[in-house]
């Protein structure tokens, strides 16, 4: 199914039914008094989060969603039937905003979370309500109220603990397939990844985290170049960013330091809060660098890049250094997360959008040195 992470829809709640101005008419009861019933309430529009859905594609084409109107009241004190509510199912992680006011209506972060987005109109009152000691035969009644009508902007932001950054062909998809059971498309050409890939990484019983790979960024992404700018929003919920760098590009004219600086620049231009997130440097494809050159090449990169944070040396293809990185990530998340992060990871592990997998060889990852 095609991945769609943004849509605009109109939701229209039902109008309330009108009240009835009816008089009781029965044989031998010439002055029966008022018996007009109330109108039924209009149907409301709700959204509910469903972890079995992973795209907003249903709302890319079905743009108008209407609930039924309430029925009018009738005589003999008959109340109108209320309009049926409608429920729109959306992926967990969907953010809903009112397009006219900019109001944040809902942030669907939990499975089965239900939110009212358009309230049905109240039913009108029948003339029975207007009877008094001085007005025994009232003719007044009220009309039903109109239901709410809203234009909504839907944005899907995936729920992940860790996000991967990097140029196209930095090895992000290979890395996520190496440490989890996600199966992204992998090839030796740019923009192989066209939509976010997610995987649950298990490091032991009850120890897991969710990792997200988005399409690679290129210079100018913040202004719309390439593909990655469309998906940077998916990194906004993460607690840690991994900046993957190809330390052995096929094209010798490519400078990894210049590419790394471009990524950081695009991140800052797109969202300052993303730039401020904790970020680790992961130097990938070291299996392509001769052993006697590795230390010097790593040191040269770190010096020219001016990096002072955590650095990991890995080969996503062979798995070298990946286990140590996985354990370091888990330890960091446990130390810096709130109390319910582990519970959230377990909930996400059961989500069909995420592939739950043990470590390499079917066993939990064993610790491996790799951080500087």
From Swiss-Prot:
HAMAP family linked: GTPase_Obg
Catalytic class of the enzyme: hydrolase
Protein name: GTPase Obg
GO biological process, one term: ribosome biogenesis
InterPro entries tied to this protein: G_OBG, GTP-bd, GTP-bd_Obg/CgtA, GTP1-OBG_CS, GTP1_OBG_dom, GTP1_OBG_dom_sf, OBG_GTPase, P-loop_NTPase
Record-linked PROSITE patterns: G_OBG (PS51710), GTP1_OBG (PS00905), OBG (PS51883)
Subcellular location as annotated: Cytoplasm
